[in-house]
Amino acid sequence: MPAILSRVAPRTFNLVGSRLMASAARLETVPREEIHKEYDRKKTFYHRDLEIQLAGPTQLKTKPLDPTKLKFGHTYADYMMTCDWDAERGWHHPKIEPIGELKIHPGAKVLHYASELFEGMKAYRGIDNKIRMFRPEMNMARMKRTALRAALPDFDSEEMINVLTELLRLDQEWVPNSDVCSLYLRPTLIGTDPTLGVGCATEAKMFVITGPVGAYYSTGFQPVSLLADSRFIRAFPGGVGAYKMGCNYAPTIWVGKEAASKNCQQVLWLYGENEDLTEVGTMNIFLFWKNEEGDMELITPPLHRGLILPGVTRDSLLELGREWGEYKVTERTLNMEEVKKALSEKRLYEMFGSGTACVVSPVGKILYHNKVTDEYEELHIPTMSSKFGVMQKFYNTINDIQYGRIIKDGWMRDI
């Protein structure tokens, strides 16, 4: 059976099988029967097809001397991953190349109809100097669900994780040697076909950029104040609040400015006549209290209504809380009236957000707009003075897992 030949350019590497092979003037061969048997580019791109263009000396950037002082999202590493898709051919070969600008037509779907989704994940340099990703399978599963909802192309999670691993190997010097810093990864999928009119994208681009990020709390935990006003809604049943799409974030910016004008750092998103709690800022929300039955309980809103992004950190905290067995762990709807009642009865001990950026974020105050009186009420949350230390234990444990001080089976992926 004849072989299919593929030539790659000088200073480019091609992945066939499991490792890099130099290809300055080299032909790689893959048996045609293997292609027919295993390749289906309508379904996914493949790690084995990965092409890597190495950066020249002038393209490599100076790394920050003190990563703890980095501002989130302002510094990028040397490389990025890209992979194109079109409806006729399916996925093209994935590529890793020096980071640079994308060329996109002004009529691209993403620019007009927000045909887009993204993920946020991190890689950590452990105390043993090994680099690991935190639960990447969960990020990829969520990204695939979002792609389906956005009518963008599907892909295989393991193929994507393997490509991310190669990207991290090239950018490994950008992973800070610090137990409070990390390398942030932003996988993104956009519709790119240059046609106006609402409809399914016939062309798309996957890309991944990375960058080092400092400690979220450089001087220790800083409790945040929340604006809670049910006149502003983040998500609704049947919508896309449970998916990581850019269209969920842009409409929240103005509300965030309103919160800042009232000396609040985040928004506590409420929903419905009962003012159900959903999210805090871009984080999931947790409460630790004594419930009305007298049980100590960790509680967070449920996912079933589609109002809440299923956070990786959220899932991790729930799993740890249930493993510890020190209190009841519950996912159920809760509303502002319950919060106010628990505060008045002094049985609400801690409230905190959870997310990739910070692990946990303590809440110190809620500025609540009372829709009956049309006045604002200040509700003080005793998170920082809590004797139970539930939030702190979560932070310490997740941090220890991420940096390799604690081994948690299946949670960290070595690169």
From Swiss-Prot:
Catalytic activity: L-leucine + 2-oxoglutarate = 4-methyl-2-oxopentanoate + L-glutamate; L-isoleucine + 2-oxoglutarate = (S)-3-methyl-2-oxopentanoate + L-glutamate; L-valine + 2-oxoglutarate = 3-methyl-2-oxobutanoate + L-glutamate
Gene Ontology BP terms: determination of adult lifespan; embryo development ending in birth or egg hatching; isoleucine catabolic process; L-leucine biosynthetic process; L-leucine catabolic process; L-valine biosynthetic process; nematode larval development; valine catabolic process
EC nos: 2.6.1.42
Record-level Gene Ontology MF annotations: branched-chain-amino-acid transaminase activity; L-isoleucine-2-oxoglutarate transaminase activity; L-leucine-2-oxoglutarate transaminase activity; L-valine-2-oxoglutarate transaminase activity
Enzyme class: transferase
Transmembrane segments: none
Main localization of the protein described in the UniProt heading: cytoplasm
InterPro entries assigned to the protein according to its UniProt record, in alphabetical order: Aminotrans_IV, Aminotrans_IV_CS, Aminotransferase-like, B_amino_transII, BCAT-like_C, BCAT-like_N, BCAT_family
Pfam family name, one: Aminotran_4
Disruption phenotype: RNAi-mediated knockdown extends mean lifespan by 25% and maximum lifespan by 19%, increases maximum moving speed, and increases levels of the enzyme substrates, L-leucine, L-isoleucine and L-valine.
Requisite cofactors: pyridoxal 5'-phosphate
Family: Belongs to the class-IV pyridoxal-phosphate-dependent aminotransferase family.
PANTHER family membership: BRANCHED-CHAIN-AMINO-ACID AMINOTRANSFERASE (PTHR11825:SF44), SUBGROUP IIII AMINOTRANSFERASE (PTHR11825)
Protein name: Branched-chain-amino-acid aminotransferase, cytosolic
Phylogenetic placement of the source organism: Eukaryota, Metazoa, Ecdysozoa, Nematoda, Chromadorea
Gene field: bcat-1
